[in-house]
Amino acid sequence: MKRNVLLLPLLIFLLIAAALLWQLARNAQGDDPTNLESALTGKPVPAFRLESLETPGQYYQAEVLTQGKPVLLNVWATWCPTCRAEHQYLNRLAAQGIRVVGLNYKDDRAKAVAWLKELGNPYALSLSDSDGMLGLDLGVYGAPETFLIDGRGIIRYRHAGDLNARVWESELKPLWDRYSREAAQ
């Protein structure tokens, strides 16, 4: 009896270790947790009322994302090192006429405004989600994340991680072109 009690912690440890190794092997084979599809894909952007990041007291609602043309909703924060890495590419997309709306997520307003002044502002509009409620409604679990929203306000794609040239060309641009054509008809 005493021996069985002593073996129980070892057995539990071995089971946990096996489960961890199994998950690591899955990730190595391409089961990337950042590729999880959003539960909101194919559904309208959740209703919201958020303050402008740069103009305190000015509020926007979800309709700002439903202006007949596609838009990228980029979730970012100054505390996010990957957001800094993707920022230059977002500036390039904006310079090409891609409409990007920024959602500053759980961040300090003054730091965020200073960040945009320092690194450039790719956002046609910057919204402040200081309490993270819209992020929660969108299923955001970190920053950066980027959502492609069609001209009717339907979420068509979610990308977790930095938006770079490879991701844009292979994943987002084909969808952007498709929904841009649909909006033009």
Curated annotation (Swiss-Prot):
<feature type="transmembrane region" description="Helical">
    <location>
        <begin position="5"/>
        <end position="25"/>
    </location>
</feature>
<dbReference type="Pfam" id="PF08534">
    <property type="entry name" value="Redoxin"/>
</dbReference>
<dbReference type="InterPro" id="IPR036249">
    <property type="entry name" value="Thioredoxin-like_sf"/>
</dbReference>
<keyword id="KW-0201">Cytochrome c-type biogenesis</keyword>
<feature type="domain" description="Thioredoxin">
    <location>
        <begin position="39"/>
        <end position="177"/>
    </location>
</feature>
<dbReference type="GO" id="GO:0017004">
    <property type="term" value="P:cytochrome complex assembly"/>
</dbReference>
<keyword id="KW-0997">Cell inner membrane</keyword>
<dbReference type="InterPro" id="IPR050553">
    <property type="entry name" value="Thioredoxin_ResA/DsbE_sf"/>
</dbReference>
<dbReference type="InterPro" id="IPR013740">
    <property type="entry name" value="Redoxin"/>
</dbReference>
<comment type="function">
    <text>Involved in disulfide bond formation. Catalyzes a late, reductive step in the assembly of periplasmic c-type cytochromes, probably the reduction of disulfide bonds of the apocytochrome c to allow covalent linkage with the heme. Possible subunit of a heme lyase.</text>
</comment>
<keyword id="KW-1133">Transmembrane helix</keyword>
<feature type="topological domain" description="Periplasmic">
    <location>
        <begin position="26"/>
        <end position="185"/>
    </location>
</feature>
<feature type="disulfide bond" description="Redox-active">
    <location>
        <begin position="80"/>
        <end position="83"/>
    </location>
</feature>
<dbReference type="GO" id="GO:0005886">
    <property type="term" value="C:plasma membrane"/>
</dbReference>
<keyword id="KW-1015">Disulfide bond</keyword>
<comment type="similarity">
    <text>Belongs to the thioredoxin family. DsbE subfamily.</text>
</comment>
<keyword id="KW-1003">Cell membrane</keyword>
<keyword id="KW-0676">Redox-active center</keyword>
<dbReference type="InterPro" id="IPR004799">
    <property type="entry name" value="Periplasmic_diS_OxRdtase_DsbE"/>
</dbReference>
<dbReference type="InterPro" id="IPR017937">
    <property type="entry name" value="Thioredoxin_CS"/>
</dbReference>
<keyword id="KW-0472">Membrane</keyword>
<keyword id="KW-0812">Transmembrane</keyword>
<dbReference type="GO" id="GO:0030288">
    <property type="term" value="C:outer membrane-bounded periplasmic space"/>
</dbReference>
<dbReference type="InterPro" id="IPR013766">
    <property type="entry name" value="Thioredoxin_domain"/>
</dbReference>
<protein>
    <recommendedName>
        <fullName>Thiol:disulfide interchange protein DsbE</fullName>
    </recommendedName>
</protein>
<dbReference type="GO" id="GO:0015036">
    <property type="term" value="F:disulfide oxidoreductase activity"/>
</dbReference>
<feature type="topological domain" description="Cytoplasmic">
    <location>
        <begin position="1"/>
        <end position="4"/>
    </location>
</feature>
